[in-house]
Amino acid sequence: MVTLSQHAYAEYDLAEVGSVVRLPAALDGKPFPGEPLGCAMNILARAGIETGQTVAIVGIGFLGALLTRLATDAGARVIAIARRPFALGIARAMGAAETVAMDDHWRIIEAVTALTDGRLCARVIEATGKQWPLDLAAELTAERGRLVIAGYHQDGPRQVNMQQWNWRGLDVINAHERDPARYVQGMRAAVAAVAEGRLDPAPLYTHSYPLARLDEALAATRDRPEGFMKAFVVP
């Protein structure tokens, strides 16, 4: 089972029945981080991606990689933008049509402009939680396009170019859900997608740690060593 609760890293937990989603037999013994997988499904729904659209995903961590696969399967042409070469390789494996190294602000804009014949992107998903990639994501969004904020911004206020957002007529979507029922809905959608083979997150689980080495797992999540995408902790 997967559940919403506030007791991470515990061997046992107690949760409301409405916050628990039963896993099918096909997922027995397989890691299934319900909250982030459900989060990806909810972001996809909020993004409103349509077949034939060009979608830029800024930041290819676990969430960005999942969204690359989901957006590709929705019929979009995905341009993945990430700092690490390893992450760009993951994005290609998850279906990205194009990859761009996240190194220089103006070079990235020029690259995406060229890849889209000057039209930029109908949908841009920012999945880093940092100021510069948020600025970059806005630059890559086409007129009347949709800027989807999926990154978790937690290190202080953000400044945005409101004149640019206004001039381009952007729809700006905060894709974070706070209603527990929406969380559970996303987790149910994720369970179905993985069980039916429409989404395979297994290649993204690059590291595993026992609970006794939780400190190492958290350090890896912070430092992102070469080859790291997602760690799971087992009792």
PLM region spans:
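C-terminal hydrophobic helical "lid"/dimerization subdomain
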Residues: 135-138, 186-235
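Glycine-rich cofactor phosphate-binding loops and adjacent beta1-alpha1 units
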Residues: 97-171
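Hydrophobic beta-strand signal
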Residues: 1-3, 56, 148
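Mid-domain Rossmann-like dinucleotide-binding core that forms the NAD(H)/NADP(H) cofactor-binding site
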Residues: 30-104
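Glycine/charged-rich beta-loop-alpha catalytic/anionic-binding loops adjacent to active sites
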Residues: 19-29, 53, 119, 171
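C-terminal substrate-binding/catalytic core of Rossmann-like NAD(P)-dependent dehydrogenases/reductases
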Residues: 110-113, 156-205, 216
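Short, glycine/polar-rich helix-capping loops at beta-to-alpha or helix-loop-helix junctions
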Residues: 8-11, 83-90, 156-162
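Glycine-rich phosphate/adenylate-binding loop and adjacent beta-alpha elements
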Residues: 1-21
